[in-house]
């Protein structure tokens, strides 16, 4: 399984040769493409061709392209990499409303629980309240517990004056981290043959990644935890911060009772969703649980 997250921050030319990504910035570096899960091109002075994007897509690499402010503006994903794409698409279309609501219930419960765990890890007030709130989530989140939890959570985490959507450094870091997580989830969904436009809950007709937006929800608190511990007292989002946010994919979380990297956990989550859909049993879905930040060492 691919495990590397690569970020290109300085002017360079990129190419692929003999199944290696070649990075040339005066010196030449080689990385096996089969090892790469996500490539982030931060500098607008990086040169590459459509052949590069084609080769990366063939190796199921999610390529994120940033603007002059180093903010992600585009994600390039592979198409038709699964050998039973039609079967999976048919399975998506045949999902009942009741089943989709149950899947969303599970996702929302885990997201709110992880928000509570984030507060508990940081010794902030409100962790137990959110965990109890997560247990009360109904099918389809009929009582809108997600919104109730989010309003409480962000105030407890970043203070009463914090507003999600402001242009401050905390929001910039959150948005950057969420985009990386979203791209990793979208990449894995595509690898398993899912059409990311067809969401379980998100259904924006202008959004090509509704399903990725559904399944990234339990991962958001991992980004929040990192941002609180590393950004809360900073004035700007530096290159070092962005590199670490990309590297979050190699930190640990818990899924199915075992420690895994976030990348591996995403794969297990999507794999379990495939099984849950094929057997029409929402209880088979496995979702990640956060833990104190710790790098995952691959064996």
Could you describe each region identified by the protein language model?
Residues 2-5, 11-12, 26, 58, ...:
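Active-site helix-to-loop segments that bind/position phosphate- or nucleotide-bearing substrates
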Residues 8-50, 54:
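N-terminal ordered "arm"
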Residues 35-84:
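Glycine/small-residue-rich interface belts in oligomeric ring/scaffold proteins
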């Amino acid at each position: 399984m691919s495990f590397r997250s690569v970020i290109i921050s300085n002017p360079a030319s990129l190419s692929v040769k003999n199944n290696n990504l070649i990075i040339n910035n005066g010196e030449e570096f080689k990385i096996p493409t089969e090892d790469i899960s996500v490539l982030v091109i931060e500098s607008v002075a990086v040169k590459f061709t459509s052949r590069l994007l084609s080769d990366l897509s063939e190796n199921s690499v999610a390529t994120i392209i940033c603007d002059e402010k180093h903010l992600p503006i585009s994600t390039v994903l592979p198409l038709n990499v699964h050998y039973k794409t039609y079967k999976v698409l048919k399975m998506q279309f045949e999902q009942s409303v009741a089943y989709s609501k149950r899947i969303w219930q599970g996702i929302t419960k885990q997201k709110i629980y992880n928000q509570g765990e984030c507060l508990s890890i940081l010794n902030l007030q409100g962790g137990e309240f959110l965990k109890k709130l997560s247990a009360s989530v109904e099918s389809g989140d009929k009582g809108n517990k997600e919104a109730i939890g989010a309003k409480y959570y962000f105030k407890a985490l970043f203070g009463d004056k914090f507003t999600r959507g402001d242009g401050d450094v905390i929001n910039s870091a959150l948005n950057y981290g969420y985009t990386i997580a979203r791209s990793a989830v979208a990449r894995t969904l595509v690898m398993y043959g899912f059409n990311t436009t067809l969401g379980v809950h998100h259904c924006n007709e202008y959004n090509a990644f509704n399903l990725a937006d559904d399944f990234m929800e339990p991962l958001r608190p991992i980004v929040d935890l990192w941002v609180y511990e590393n950004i809360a007292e900073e004035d700007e989002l530096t290159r070092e911060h962005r590199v670490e946010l990309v590297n979050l994919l190699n930190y640990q979380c818990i899924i199915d009772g075992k420690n895994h990297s976030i990348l591996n956990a995403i794969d297990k989550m999507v794999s379990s969703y495939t099984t849950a859909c094929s057997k029409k049993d929402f209880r088979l879905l496995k979702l990640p649980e956060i833990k104190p930040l710790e790098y995952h060492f691959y064996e």
